[in-house]
Amino acid sequence: VQENSVANAWEGVSGGAYDAVAAECVALKKALGLNDWGYYDLVRTLADGFCGPKTNESVVLQSFLMAEAGYKVRMARGGGRLFLLLATDGQVYARPYFNIDGQVFYILDDVPRAASYNICNFTIPGERPLSLAMPAPPLFAQKPAAPAVRNFDGVVSTTVTVNRNLMDFYTNYPPCHWSIYAATALTAPVRGQLYPPLRAAVAGKGEREAAELLLHYLHRAFPYKTDEAQFGVERTLFAEEMYYYPYSDCEDRSILFARLVKDLLGLDVVLLYYPAHIATAVCFKGEVKGDYMQLGNKRYVICDATYIGCLLYTSPSPRDRQKS
């Protein structure tokens, strides 16, 4: 692939023939409530459909449509093919990346890597990085998955049916920081199924007792398995995916527990990273004894959603605690 052929292809797509397509893509992004990553996924799917999956022509069309929407894009040549490079506002794991003029760009598509790359560097006024944050889940058509029944020793039982279309979208999400997963809300249909029985279970309880019940729900109702054992690779789940996949590990449970505590108890939470482990810490309004982290003027009591029977503890030692 020669540089002049790339320039000619860019001139071809930017000459006005695809302006209506670009406008329709932006309109569809709004209609579906897509975040920036969702828009890229839409553009990639459309371009692959028009031009053939993972072809050079598809990459050129993707770069034009993303640039037209204001995103910071570049292209690279290597191994006889073109690659789309996208700047993001946060780190993406397990993807090739390039530092171009102080900005990190990633190859987000799952394509074979080249031995070396030549960057086609250009700038467009007003361009911005792609955000990985998801202010709200996308509004996909409903395609019900099998109902997931989660039972905590007869104390509380939940039955949740998630949207398989949303699960497919989450499956393709680029691996990124846990804060992105933790900040993503549950969809309204899932909240409508999940929250009534949980609210009934914590009704009339104090903060600590209510948090402990939610914690034991995570301990007892969700079988544990490492990502390597379940998926073959490291993978963090969005909270809603806990009702789609049969197993979960420490960060998945911590993310769902944080979401339940925020939504049902109205308490502030943070995630804590230990070597090879993640836990949650809760800022209780009343006095709750236990190990804690002080952040500013707030005291966050450490809670662990992985080790059976634990609400508060001194250290997350796998030698001393059984994983659920």
What is each of the regions a protein language model found here?
Residues 292-306:
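Catalytic Cys-His active-site segments of thiol-dependent hydrolases/isopeptidases
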Residues 1-123:
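Mixed-charge, low-complexity segments
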Residues 313-322:
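Conserved small/polar residues in nucleotide/adenosyl-binding loops
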Residues 49-62, 225-285:
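Active-site neighborhood of thiol-dependent amide/isopeptide-bond enzymes
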Residues 65, 69-73, 198, 202, ...:
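Sec/Tat-exported extracytoplasmic proteins
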Residues 284-287, 306-308:
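Solvent-exposed coil/turn segments that connect beta secondary-structure elements
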Residues 4-43, 180-244, 306:
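Secondary-structure boundary elements
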Residues 71-186:
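Extended, non-transmembrane interaction/recognition domains
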